[in-house]
Amino acid sequence: MEFFFYSSSLATIVFTVCSIFSRNLMYSLLYLILSFVFTSCVFFSLGATFAAALEVIIYAGAIMVLFVFFIMMFNFKKSTLYAEKIFDKNNYYYINFLFLLCILIFPFFFILSYLYKEKIFYMVVSTKLVAIKLFSDYILVIELSSIVLLSALIIVSHIGKIRR
């Protein structure tokens, strides 16, 4: 389970950096989606299955898909990121060197964790306990958020009828 934790953590970092430095906006969003998926793998390896499911459903499943549809709808060919102006082809050698350095240092920390026999602490939180806590102690927050979502739905449908 520790190897799964460390490998998904490394993949999260790599895909986040790829998302930041990607020149194509669509690829950048896809890297960010992969970063969210591997972040949920980190949560899963720590025993927080509910947080992992929420990470995939809310971030990767809903928000990022909306971003992808937005980019596809407005048809952006290339992004105007600040990173494009800073990093030219000569500076990519430094980025590749940093990635290589991270890949070489990663096994060193993995071996150190086995030497000191420190295990990752995790506690399994069941979905039932989260639901009981949400709908007993935090019922007012749940109801207020549902009212906000309902009002947003009504406003969007009203704006849609006006534009027709």
From Swiss-Prot:
Keywords: Cell membrane, Membrane, NAD, Quinone, Translocase, Transmembrane, Transmembrane helix. Pfam families: Oxidored_q3 (PF00499). The chain crosses the membrane at residues 1-21, 30-50, 54-74, 94-114, 138-158. Its EC number is 7.1.1.-. It is an enzyme of class 7 (translocase). InterPro entries: NADH_UbQ/plastoQ_OxRdtase_su6, Nuo/plastoQ_OxRdtase_6_NuoJ. Its main location: membrane. It is a multi-pass membrane protein. One of its GO terms (cellular component) is plasma membrane. It is found in: Cell membrane. Belongs to the complex I subunit 6 family. Composed of 13 different subunits. Subunits NuoA, H, J, K, L, M, N constitute the membrane sector of the complex. PANTHER family: NADH-UBIQUINONE OXIDOREDUCTASE CHAIN 6 (PTHR33269:SF17). NDH-1 shuttles electrons from NADH, via FMN and iron-sulfur (Fe-S) centers, to quinones in the respiratory chain. Couples the redox reaction to proton translocation (for every two electrons transferred, four hydrogen ions are translocated across the cytoplasmic membrane), and thus conserves the redox energy in a proton gradient. This is NADH-quinone oxidoreductase subunit J. The lineage of its organism: Bacteria, Pseudomonadati, Pseudomonadota, Gammaproteobacteria, Enterobacterales.
